[in-house]
């Protein structure tokens, strides 16, 4: 009777149209229910039965209903699934496979099956790559995934590395070597092999890509020659090797080992500036005045050099600091070290007055055993030899930025524009509330930004510095020149690490075109997108492996009385994020660990403070003592508790 009834169809359509709908992102909880967060402002309750249709992180459209004075969201349409490609662990039960995604808020096993090409016999605990293929909001009965790749078994000691690389879809191996010979016969090279070039690196470094030589001009100035390894002499543009390097974009440095951008025979041998080996290079010569100014006589050329010594950071630093456990091999090398130290001091003073100098932060290096276990974490402070190399490389990159800008008008530039114009008023308000008057428009200029940074660096704590960082833009990679506010420089283009960075290889080719007077093509914008994306993925991979190793390292300390000094690096509504200064690990302190009565404690990201009953007890950048309360190995989270 009601079949094909137009009135009934009209009524259904009317009800459907009148039902309120919202679009948002599903937030799961450990208790089965969830919330639909809309624009970060409002959230709606999703009951457990409805949560079975969705997954944490899904973007959906939901209908809104009222139940006992509470608005409830009922998932209706999938806009964008949270999971597409992911990694997880296999569960095997009676020949039936399921996979638990490796994510802190995804605990439920998902039915899965291997794709036809995958012949591996899966066992409990295996790590795999999977692709979601079914979703309840797409009309399927349940979630289902296809297993697309086997990563490793659950007992592999190197799980942190292999799983992380698979998660971010990054290479595990060095590229294969192909037949390579010098291919730039038309490029005239000066013979500088008689000069006393030296390299300064870590003791374990094999891919030495920069060598330095200084000549004292006798009038208080120096002529600095920076020689940079020349892989583009072997790698033809658009060749198989070049396309591989372009895809990888960077050498991927992970705790314990690296995955190079170029084949190891190139990066660690043919191109590496090994001592007493003749190597093709690009060189930059520039006069540096006694005050540290770069003169206008910048000159780039191609050359042959022969490094006379592979020096090590700690050896050089010890010798310059008067510790004579190590000595330079001869007076010529000793003279080079002494002259490089003078250049470093002059350039550092110039940058402090006219640009910006980053505050020294230690590096943390994992000392690993044969099975990937963390034996120790070494704190490596930046010493004078590190600063020598840093000052010379910054000078070289400024020279390239200016030369490319003047001769070509393009290149691969590192650009940082300081404050976001949309947020600069907020930054000025935060500064004013903390006793610093700043004109928002002046903050958007390079001199204004530098003046503020110098003022903040002179303050006794980093509280204000950390508070205004969120109003700043991120550094970008650009094909056109632009300022680098973070360094306080009007232009910055790197070319000093072409073995490790594809953008530097691009700049090498442009510099060669400039040297020979040939026509040069502006790099495609797609290259900057690829470089930025790969840089992001490599950083995430380094962080993820680090988190895993920190969790392993700190697990024995959980629940003990061992104290750690920590710096508060972030304050969120739920608690504090701190960095342990002894080893670099990041831990979370939940708000209830700060004060038992939850309503009396306010953790505010806005003010960068924690207040108990209206009194400020902690501020961002404070140093506090903590103990490790718990290490959650499945999520690699370290939970800490303040020492009372």
From Swiss-Prot:
It is found in: Cytoplasm. Its EC number is 3.1.13.1. It comes from the Bacteria. It is an enzyme of class 3 (hydrolase). It comes from Yersinia pseudotuberculosis serotype IB (strain PB1/+). GO terms for biological process: mRNA catabolic process. InterPro entries: CSD, NA-bd_OB-fold, RNase_B_OB_dom, RNase_II, RNase_II/R, RNase_II/R_CS, RNase_II/RNase_R, RNR_Ribonuclease. Residues 561-643 form the S1 motif domain. HAMAP family: RNase_II. This is Exoribonuclease 2. Involved in mRNA degradation. Hydrolyzes single-stranded polyribonucleotides processively in the 3' to 5' direction. Pfam families: OB_RNB, RNB, S1. GO terms for molecular function: exoribonuclease II activity; RNA binding.
């Amino acid at each position: 009777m009601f079949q094909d009834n137009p009135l009934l169809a009209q009524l259904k359509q009317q009800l459907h149209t009148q039902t309120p709908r919202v679009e948002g992102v599903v937030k799961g909880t450990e208790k089965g229910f969830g919330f639909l967060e809309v624009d970060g402002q409002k959230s709606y309750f999703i009951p457990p039965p409805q949560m079975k249709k969705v997954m944490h992180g899904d973007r959906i459209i939901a209908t809104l209903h009222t139940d006992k004075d509470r608005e409830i969201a009922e998932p209706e349409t999938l806009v964008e699934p949270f999971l597409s490609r992911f990694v997880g662990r296999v569960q095997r039960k009676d020949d039936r496979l399921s996979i638990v995604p490796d994510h802190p808020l995804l605990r439920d096993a998902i039915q899965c099956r291997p794709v036809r090409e995958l012949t591996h016999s899966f066992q409990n605990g295996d790590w795999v790559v999977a692709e979601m293929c079914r979703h309840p909001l797409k009309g399927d009965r349940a979630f289902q995934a296809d297993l697309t790749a086997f990563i490793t078994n659950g007992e592999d000691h190197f799980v942190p590395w292999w799983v992380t690389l698979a998660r971010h879809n990054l290479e595990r191996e060095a590229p294969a070597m192909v037949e390579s010979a010098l291919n730039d016969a038309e490029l005239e090279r000066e013979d500088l092999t008689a000069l006393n070039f030296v390299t300064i690196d870590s003791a374990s470094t094999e891919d030495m890509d920069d060598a330095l030589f200084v000549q004292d001009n006798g009038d208080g100035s120096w002529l600095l020659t920076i020689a940079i390894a020349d892989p583009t002499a072997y790698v033809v543009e658009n060749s198989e090797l070049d396309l591989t390097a372009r895809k990888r974009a960077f050498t991927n440095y992970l705790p314990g080992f690296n995955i190079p951008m170029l084949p190891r025979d190139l990066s660690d041998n043919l191109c590496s500036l090994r001592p007493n080996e003749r190597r093709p290079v690009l060189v930059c010569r520039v006069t540096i005045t006694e005050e540290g100014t770069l003169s206008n006589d910048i000159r780039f050329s191609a050359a042959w050099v022969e490094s006379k010594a592979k020096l090590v950071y700690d050896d050089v630093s010890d010798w310059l600091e008067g510790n004579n456990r190590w000595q330079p091999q001869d007076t010529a090398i000793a003279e080079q070290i002494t002259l490089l130290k003078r250049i470093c001091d002059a350039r550092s003073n110039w940058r402090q007055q006219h640009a910006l100098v980053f505050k020294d932060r230690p590096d943390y290096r994992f000392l690993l055993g044969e099975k990937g276990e963390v034996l120790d974490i070494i704190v490596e402070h930046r010493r004078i030899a590190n600063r020598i190399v840093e000052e010379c490389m910054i000078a070289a990159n400024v020279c390239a930025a200016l030369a490319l800008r003047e001769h070509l008008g393009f290149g691969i530039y590192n650009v940082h524009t300081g404050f976001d114009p949309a947020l600069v008023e907020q930054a000025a308000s935060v500064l004013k509330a903390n006793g610093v008057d700043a004109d928002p428009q002046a903050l958007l200029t390079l001199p204004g930004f530098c003046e503020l940074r110098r003022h903040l660096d002179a303050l006794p704590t980093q509280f204000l510095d950390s508070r205004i960082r969120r109003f700043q833009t991120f550094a970008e990679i650009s094909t056109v020149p632009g300022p680098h506010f973070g360094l306080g420089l009007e232009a910055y283009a790197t070319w000093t690490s072409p073995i490790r960075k594809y953008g530097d290889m691009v700049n090498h080719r442009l510099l060669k075109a400039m040297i020979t007077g040939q026509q040069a093509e502006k790099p495609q914008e797609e290259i900057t997108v690829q470089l930025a994306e790969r840089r992001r993925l490599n950083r995430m991979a380094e962080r993820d492996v680090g988190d895993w190793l920190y969790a392993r390292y700190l697990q024995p300390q959980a629940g003990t009385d061992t104290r750690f000094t920590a710096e508060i690096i972030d304050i969120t509504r739920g608690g504090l994020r701190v960095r342990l200064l002894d080893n670099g690990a990041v831990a979370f302190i939940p708000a209830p660990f700060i004060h038992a009565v939850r309503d009396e404690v306010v953790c505010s990201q806005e003010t960068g403070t924690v207040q108990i009953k209206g009194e400020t007890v902690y501020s961002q950048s404070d140093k506090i003592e903590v103990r490790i309360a718990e290490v959650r190995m499945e999520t690699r989270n370290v939970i800490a508790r303040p020492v009372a």
